[in-house]
Amino acid sequence: MGKTALIHHVFQQILKEKLAYCLYVDLYPTASIRDLTRQLATATMNVLPQRKRIGKKFISFLKSLRPVIKYDPLTGSPEVRFEYATDTDYEVTLSALLNFLNEQETDVCLAFDEFQVVTSYAEGNAEAILRTMIQPLNNIHFIFSGSNRHMMNEIFHDSKRPFFASTRIVSLPAIPSEEYGRFIEDRFNERKRTITSDAIGFIIDWTRRHTYYTQSVCNTIYGSGGKNIDLQSVKVICGEILEEQEKTFLQYRHLLTLNQWQILMAVAKEGKVYRPTAAEFLEKYSPGTPAGVTRALDSLMTKEMIYEESDINGRYYSVYDLFLSRWLERQ
C-alpha cells in the first residue's frame, strides 16, 4: 500500500465511524493557486452529500463564488472552475472555501497529496499564502503528503520556510519481515495458490519491504497464473520486470552526465551510501573528487534519482526507484 492508498484507507475508517468528512486533493496536476482552488472546490462538491443539509449549504455558498460547473462525459462527476480576472480573486475564493469547511459542525479531514508541488507554483510565495490561510483554521485536520522527500523535508524542516514547525511529522517504518511474509502467504493461499517461504523471503529482501514494489512484484507473480510458486519462478519474474523497463532506464543515461551516471550506479550497487566522499568509496568506484561527488549527488537529488534518509547508522543516500536500483546492480 502506497501513501495515497494509505490515505484513502484511513479515510474509509474515519467515514465508517462517521467521525468527519474526508477530502482528498491531488496537487500533482496543479501549477498555481488558481488550479488548487479548482481542485478543492471540485473535491468538496463530489464529497459533500448534495441532498443533505451540508451539501445544500455548499451549493448555495458555491453559487456566490460565480463558478462554472461542467460534468465529466465519462464519469458524470462535476468539475468546478472559476473564471476570475486576477490572482487575488482566486486567493479570496480559496480562503472562502477553507473557511466554509472550517465552520461546519462536523470535523473535516483534508489531504493535500503531492504537496511539494506548491514550491513551484506560479505565485512564487504560495507556501506563505497557504500558511496564512491554514493557520487560524481549527476544525480542519490537514494531511500533507508528498513523493519528493527532499522537497517535503525542506518545506517542513527549514526554519526559514512558512510551514516550519507547523505540523507533526509522521514517519512510516518498513513492515517487519515476518509479519509481511505471513500477509503475503495468506493472500496467495486465499486464491488457492501456494508460495514457498524462500520465495517470500526473496520478494521481501529484493523489494526492501517497500510496499509499492512488494505489491507490484506480488501482483505480477499472481498475474503469471502459476499455482505453485517457488524461488526460481520469482527470480525469473523479477528479471522480467526489469527487462520490461530497460528502455526507460536507458533513457536516464542520456539525461545525466557521465559522472552522475557513475555515481548513480555506485549508489545502486551499494544499496545505501553513508560516506560518499570517504576514501573507501572513492577508491572503489573512482567517481571523481569529493567536491565533484557532492555536486553530482545534489544534482541527482534535484532530479529525484536518489534520496537522502537516516537510520541508526546515520544519514545515507539510496536510489529513489528500487527497480532502477536493481537494474543498475546488474550492469
Where are these regions (language model features)?
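P-loop NTPase nucleotide-binding core
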Residues: M1-C109
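Alpha-helical DNA-recognition elements
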Residues: Q13, I129, T220, S299-K303
